[in-house]
Amino acid sequence: MRYRRVQYGLVAAILPRQRRKIMYQDDYRRIDEMMRKKGVFTNLETGKQYYTGYEYATLYDWDQYFEAIVQLYLGWQSDYARLGVEIFLDTQKENGHIQRSSDGSEYQLLEHVKPFLSQICLLIYNRDGQVDFLSDKDFYYFNRLKRYLDYWLLRPENYYGLAFWDSSLHTGMDNQRDRAGHWSACYCCGVDLNCYLVRECRALALLARILKHDKDAEIYDAHAERLAQTILEKMWSPEDGFFYDIDRRTGEQIKVRYIGAFATMWADVATKEMAKSMVENYLLNPREFNRGFIYPVLSASMPNYIEAPLPEDWGCSWRANTWIPTNYYVFEALRKYGYVDEATHLANETYRQVKRIGDREYYATETQTGCGLDPFWGWSLLAYFMPYENESGYDPTKILVEKNDKILLT
């Protein structure tokens, strides 16, 4: 059954524009104060300062991309974002591998950093107009960026060039074991991962052109196009009208529907018809993703769609739970493909729910309550900027060179 597009009312328009601006400024001042007080730490090995939303001071890979967007909106200098990238690149091994967090368990440190470092550098360039730190010392950090991305792209175990996660913990969606397995499982070619890689290759290609490394730009543009084509050929299910991960051991699709499939839209990989099926048959379907606190990270039709953790779970819960960074990139994806009303509803509803419940690490979808760290000053704070992006049309996640002078805290 196809679920029709709904004409959502503009929730934000209920309040007069000037009153909304005052309300948003109050939000921005409050979270800016909290972030400055709680989120800045110093790396003991390098002495470099960085930002993290975690009270135990760990710097995580994809978190810092979304956290950097918040910092820039609040008018912060790009230093913490830059130094966070450097901290990761400083740990690089000869083969290009970088641990995915600044500290953690033995297994965690064996897993490669998620592909967001070049995208963070592009955020920095669009704010500052330069990325000199990449070219300093004979392009020391730029060369490390290339090696880290090549580690993902050129592993001989990849399936038709599709990269794979080491475990469910590695995906960042900690307990989605149904699709990615336990520690060192190493079989899940994630739709999410390979779409992040498409974006990361395009971002590194842009940085290469900025640094006048045109040959490198051609190489990573070609990687992006090859990956995008393989995602379309191998991961799309014509029968279901949905993208699925691949088990690299068998070549079979892993029939778990999760929010990361919509990264195909965020990365401009899905065709218009594919996006139409995914949005209208799944995202808007109450039996799939259109639940209480939109949108859960796992479809409600999946067997393990529950809020409580299961035995053998590690980390946080990514099942019947709503996480703001995935809401955020689904919001950007909807706008890209012309789902304006749905994007508006998602932006306003995410803001409303976070404002009501509070700044939490994540949320229980069905009971609409907060979970995890309380308070949390990490990527969940993106919720406060989604109404602005919706009203202004601005998208800081676009992979292009575009001056970012959007400082919202006045």
Task: Specify the residue positions occupied by each region the protein language model found.
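N-terminal accessory interaction module
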Residues: K406-T410
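Alpha-helical scaffold segments in carbohydrate-active enzymes
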Residues: R30, M34, I87-D90, R144-N158, ...
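Aromatic-rich carbohydrate-recognition surfaces in CAZymes
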Residues: A57-Q64, A68-S167, V191-N194, I254, ...
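Structural helix-adjacent loops and short alpha-helical linkers that scaffold large soluble proteins
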Residues: M23-D26, L72-V85, I124-K146, L206-E225, ...
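Structured, solvent-exposed acidic/aromatic patches
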Residues: Y187-D192, D214
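Acidic/polar, glycine-enriched structural segments that form the non-catalytic walls/loops
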Residues: R2-A57, V131-L154, A208-I210, D214-D216
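Extended glycan-interaction surfaces of carbohydrate-active proteins
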Residues: R19-T58, L83-Y107, E157-C189, Q229-T322, ...
